Amino acid sequence: ANTFRFNFSHGDHQEQGDRMATVKLAEKLAGKKVGFLLDTKGPEIRTELFEGDAKEYSYKTGEKIRVATKQGIKSTRDVIALNVAGALDIYDDVEVGRQVLVDDGKLGLRVIAKDDATREFEVEVENDGVVAKQKGVNIPNTKIPFPALAERDNDDIRFGLEQGINFIAISFVRTAKDVNEVRAICEETGNGHVQLFAKIENQQGIDNLDEIIEAADGIMIARGDMGIEVPFEMV
């Protein structure tokens, strides 16, 4: 291996710092230098924690349940709550007819109505499956107004730069602005040499690919998430 990837979607700074220290020790023992790549968590949507002791909820095709966009509430079997990066309420951004895909598309929900009073979607279950807490959620063909750089990513990047990372993989890049904000942090901290790789994972990133390529040092085609956001045969 000549580069080690540190996935900041999981673990805290203590855990990541310990991993980096282990690799640095291995460098000394092997007499070889390797690259350190920080992979950001990025802006994302996940299912919320559950009320009570439930670990997951099971659903059958054709069932009708609700999805809540209000932030800071817990899920029940009848109302699945979403945790959105930046604490955004995405109710107004999602149209009737859109799919809500849970856990890499293992469960599909179709928005059939919107309740303005509760700011909840009424959804129909498209296949038998389960919903567990803190699982990833994708809403294809929907532009979510995430901040260019989430507070957590900002903190993680600054921590990684202090540890001497060489590369940053920026998750869910949608526009050149996403790359430029990370570049500004690198330059501000005297780390302008760090190379930035934009991860293309959704339709908006595809639409703005040319400007993203201009802004970044390289791109990664994250076919896993992209295969959920766009038709698989288009990846």
Regions found by a protein language model. Give the residues of each.
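Non-catalytic helical/linker scaffolds that mediate oligomerization, partner binding
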Residues: 1-235
